[in-house]
Design a protein with these regions (language model features):
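Conserved class I S-adenosyl-L-methionine
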Residues: 1-36, 38-47, 145
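Conserved SAM/SAH-binding beta-strand->alpha-helix loop
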Residues: 68-70
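Conserved SAM-binding strand-loop segment of SAM-dependent methyltransferases
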Residues: 83-95
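A short SAM/SAH-binding and catalytic strip from SAM-dependent methyltransferases
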Residues: 106-120
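A short glycine-rich, Lys/Arg-flanked "PGG" loop and its adjoining helix->strand segment in the class I
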Residues: 121-133
Length: 206
């Protein structure tokens, strides 16, 4: 899979992942924002920008880093529509190796970057490098357990992290884990809500 796949996927007027902030991003980051009315954040592999734009609506500078030009174009458009274009930045880069225009940031978010463990480790390593000491990293993924017990998400175990695999990755990073747990993500379908197992990581940069 390369950027052309994602460009084709995002090549629609609709926002395929909606324009509403992910509920786990909101739940875990709202208390952090409350302690710091102005800040900077990176949304790694942020797609169409729903999470980054939400941060900018709270008065934060946000940077959406993604490798799909189509997604980033929609992210910038959404920022304009929401009146936060002056607070939102977008640039194309690979998640495993990027340079941020806002570094060092206060919060680094990575939501649903479903890639093999080594690629995920490289992406988190780069993200952590761009977060200031005392800042936070929030990760949200379809969990490995979702393959057997949940609805939606990838059907490939290799791109589904677990609490154990994320613990292993974090052991090599300058972070302190504050939350690492499976949550019920729940997927809205035409037949109602379906159970979906989501793994959430909140860590403080040392």
């Amino acid at each position: 899979m390369d950027s052309s796949y994602w460009d084709a996927k995002f090549d629609t007027d609709d926002y395929i992942y909606t324009t509403v902030v992910n509920r786990f991003v909101k739940e875990y980051c709202e208390p952090l924002i409350a302690k710091q009315t102005q800040g900077k954040m990176i949304d790694l592999a942020g797609g169409e920008g729903r999470n980054a734009i939400w941060f900018s609506e709270q008065g934060w500078q946000s940077e959406n880093i993604d490798w799909s030009k189509k997604a980033l174009s929609k992210s910038l458009k959404l920022a304009e529509e929401r009146g936060v274009a002056d607070l939102h930045f977008a640039h194309i880069a690979d998640a495993t190796g990027f340079e941020s225009v806002l570094t060092p940031v206060d919060i680094g978010v990575v939501a649903y970057l479903q890639v093999p463990q080594q690629d995920l480790a490289d992406a988190l390593d780069t993200l952590v490098d761009n977060v200031r000491p005392g800042g936070h990293i929030l990760g949200v993924w379809h969990a490995r357990e979702n393959l057997a017990d949940g609805y939606g998400g990838p059907r490939d175990e290799a791109v589904l992290p677990s609490v154990a695999s994320l613990t292993e990755i974090c052991a090599d990073l300058p972070v302190e884990i504050e939350v690492l747990t499976n949550r019920d993500g729940q997927v809205q379908t035409k037949d109602g809500l379906k159970p979906s197992i989501t793994v959430v990581l909140l860590a403080r940069r040392l």
